[in-house]
């Protein structure tokens, strides 16, 4: 269970880093806004799912 928690936590950190870099870039480039908007929604959904997963796994690991 601990290894799953660690993988989920690393995935959360990586997705967070990608969103911190990618969101301002997506807002600064208006050329492909339709495609960027879909990716932003997808990234946000993945981030929320990972936050919930890490919280749930933290309950079981600790």
Curated annotation (Swiss-Prot):
Keywords: Membrane, Photosynthesis, Photosystem II, Reaction center, Thylakoid, Transmembrane, Transmembrane helix. Pfam families: Ycf9. GO terms for cellular component: photosystem II reaction center; plasma membrane-derived thylakoid membrane. InterPro entries: PSII_PsbZ, PSII_PsbZ_sf. It is a multi-pass membrane protein. It is found in: Cellular thylakoid membrane. GO terms for biological process: photosynthesis; photosystem II stabilization. Disulfide bonds: none annotated. The chain crosses the membrane at residues 8-28, 41-61. May control the interaction of photosystem II (PSII) cores with the light-harvesting antenna, regulates electron flow through the 2 photosystem reaction centers. PSII is a light-driven water plastoquinone oxidoreductase, using light energy to abstract electrons from H(2)O, generating a proton gradient subsequently used for ATP formation. Belongs to the PsbZ family. PSII is composed of 1 copy each of membrane proteins PsbA, PsbB, PsbC, PsbD, PsbE, PsbF, PsbH, PsbI, PsbJ, PsbK, PsbL, PsbM, PsbT, PsbX, PsbY, PsbZ, Psb30/Ycf12, peripheral proteins PsbO, CyanoQ (PsbQ), PsbU, PsbV and a large number of cofactors. It forms dimeric complexes. This is Photosystem II reaction center protein Z. It comes from Nostoc sp. (strain PCC 7120 / SAG 25.82 / UTEX 2576). The lineage of its organism: Bacteria, Bacillati, Cyanobacteriota, Cyanophyceae, Nostocales.
